[in-house]
Amino acid sequence: MKRTYQPSNVKRARKHGFRARMATKQGRSILKRRRAKGRKRLTV
């Protein structure tokens, strides 16, 4: 049986990357929250 997690860096960046976050209002609010919290890494 094939496992469910088949990692791909391209898919990862497209779904959760910085540009993907900046593309939507919700995504920008996530970045804002993470900056406020003082996260070292905002996105993957």
UniProtKB/Swiss-Prot annotation:
Highest taxon of source: Bacteria
Example GO BP: translation
Record region (Disordered): 1-44
Q: Which UniProt keywords apply?
A: Ribonucleoprotein, Ribosomal protein
Q: Name one GO cellular component term.
A: ribonucleoprotein complex
- Entry's Gene3D superfamilies? 1.10.287.3980
Q: Report if keyword Ribosomal protein is assigned.
A: yes
Instruction: Supply the Pfam families for this chain.
Output: Ribosomal_L34 (PF00468)
Compositional bias of type Basic residues: which residue ranges?
30-44
> PANTHER family given for it?
LARGE RIBOSOMAL SUBUNIT PROTEIN BL34M, MITOCHONDRIAL RIBOSOMAL PROTEIN 34 FAMILY MEMBER
HAMAP family on file: Ribosomal_bL34
Tell me what this protein is called: Large ribosomal subunit protein bL34
Q: What gene is this protein translated from?
A: rpmH
